[in-house]
Each structure stands twice: as structure tokens, then as C-alpha cells.
Amino acid sequence: MWWTPIPEDIVRDPAAFRVGRLTKAHGLKGAVKLELFTDDPDKRFVPGAEFSLQVPDSSPWHGRTLTLTELRWYNSHPVGFFEGVADRTAAESLAKAILWMTPPADEPAEPDAWYDHQLVGLKVLRDGVEVGTVSLVDHFPAQDLLHVDTPSGTVLVPFVQAIVPSVDVEAGTLVITPPLGLFEEIPDEQPTPSATSDAEPGSAPEGDDAR
């Protein structure tokens, strides 16, 4: 079973973020298929881009970095070529590796864009009440998913504007407006027992004639 510690240089750099995962070798010349965690691959995967690797301690790539030489698309699927990865054997040894990078210091911040490390740990509010804490962010082609730890378990929340309308990193909070069924509904206040509920069996309510 793979256990992949986050590289030390990434742990020390709160601005670092995941951009992809190497899935499997492609062909015989060292190419590797990619699963992208970014919606802007043309910006992140440029020739010369350097990535830190999240791999097991036992991996021959542990503690090393990868430099991209070229990104190609085959049948709408991204395939990367990297320095020092010359054949299929080397490419196969990189399967499951997660790619991390640090944005340039002069890169302007994007509106309504957050890195994983900014979201993890945020308190999740629903109608002003804290319902859980973000523990993980999953990236998928269609949308990202927030793992929200609640007292009753983990809930997966689609990270879309309609469901997560507000993120306040400085305040440490994230507001959700989930659809019915995503979270357990808060039970309504129990109705006050009617006067007839405490009546003795067979007795008639006050004011009513016995029949």
C-alpha cells in the first residue's frame, strides 16, 4: 500500500500546491500520462517547469524533482515528457507520483481562487452554525470536492459557487448552502403534546359530552 509523505520543501512552503498526478507510462520513450489538478495546464506545464514529487520513501524518486520538457495531448489526454525519464521502465517507476509546484513570487493572485492549504482547516458554516471542518480537497475534471469532517462522519461537498458561495480565509470560515440531503437536516422542534395525549384511556376531553 502506498503512503506518500508530502515533500519537506513543500511542507515548508505554504504557497505550494498540487498540479497533477502521474498515472502510467505511455509508449516506450519515457512519456507519462497525467491526471491534471489544474484548470490551466498551459500555464503550469510549460517546458522547464520544475515539480517536487510526492512519492513513498522507498521510491527511487524520493527527494528528487522533475523538469518538464514537453506536454502533449493524445486523444484529449495529457502526456508529459521529463528530463531524465528516457524509457518506459523509468516512466513506470513514476506511476502514482503527485506533482507539486510553487507559483512564481510575482504571480498575481487570481480572484476566487484558493490553494488547497488555504482551504484545509477552514470551519464550515451553514446558516451561521458550524457544521464541520474542511479536511481534504479532491480535484476532478468536472469539479473539486471538499471533504468536510462532521460529528457524524465525512461529507463530500462540491466546491461550486451555488453550494459554497463564500470563502473567507482570513476569518477561517467557509459558508455552504447545501441542497436537501447533502447534510442531515436539523430536526424540527418537537410539538407540544396536546391536551388529549395525557388523558386517561377511555376518558373524554374536557368540554365534550361523553358518548
Swiss-Prot record:
It is found in: Cytoplasm. Residues 111-182 form the PRC barrel domain. InterPro entries: PRC_barrel-like_sf, PRC_RimM, RimM, RimM_N, RimM_N_sf, Transl_B-barrel_sf. It comes from the Bacteria. It holds the Pfam family PRC_RimM. Keywords: Chaperone, Cytoplasm, Ribosome biogenesis, rRNA processing. Binds ribosomal protein uS19. This is Ribosome maturation factor RimM. It comes from Clavibacter sepedonicus (Clavibacter michiganensis subsp. sepedonicus). The gene is rimM.
